[in-house]
Amino acid sequence: MLKGFKEFLARGNIVDLAVAVVIGTAFTALVTKFTDSIITPLINRIGVNAQSDVGILRIGIGGGQTIDLNVLLSAAINFFLIAFAVYFLVVLPYNTLRKKGEVEQPGDTQVVLLTEIRDLLAQTNGDSPGRHGGRGTPSPTDGPLASTESQ
């Protein structure tokens, strides 16, 4: 059981996750402070009556009590700023790199497989492997039909 846990830790995914959590927490704190110190005061002044503290985003319900929609709006702005940053700084580059890796990998294995097939065919026909391309890559004249036509 401990061996499996050690392998899980050694894979590196847990370290990446820990780094992401720490950076995400720090970034969330930064955006929260930005929203609290700059955005919230601006929102608080929207539609406020000069004689009272009631306005468009603060609804007076009597007895000096208000429903404060400014807090909700500030939290929504905070959420969208964090979501925007995470998507464009983490998710989008990650998906781009993952797709790029997936596209390159099948092409490389296909070339290796075709090179092995060509070399096996060349050995069967008595030719030296890679003699047509010179660099170990198949040329247009390489292949099973090219070797049988010359016989």
Swiss-Prot record:
It is a multi-pass membrane protein. Signal peptide: none annotated. Gene3D superfamilies: 1.20.5.220, Large-conductance mechanosensitive channel, MscL, domain 1 (1.10.1200.120). Keywords: Cell membrane, Ion channel, Ion transport, Membrane, Transmembrane, Transmembrane helix, Transport. One of its GO terms (cellular component) is plasma membrane. InterPro entries: Mechanosensitive_channel_CS, MS_channel, MSC/AndL, MscL_channel. The lineage of its organism: Bacteria, Bacillati, Actinomycetota, Actinomycetes, Mycobacteriales. GO terms for molecular function: mechanosensitive monoatomic ion channel activity. NCBIfam families: mscL, PRK00567.1-3. This is Large-conductance mechanosensitive channel. Belongs to the MscL family. Pfam families: MscL. It comes from Mycobacterium bovis (strain BCG / Pasteur 1173P2). Its main location: membrane. HAMAP family: MscL (MF_00115).
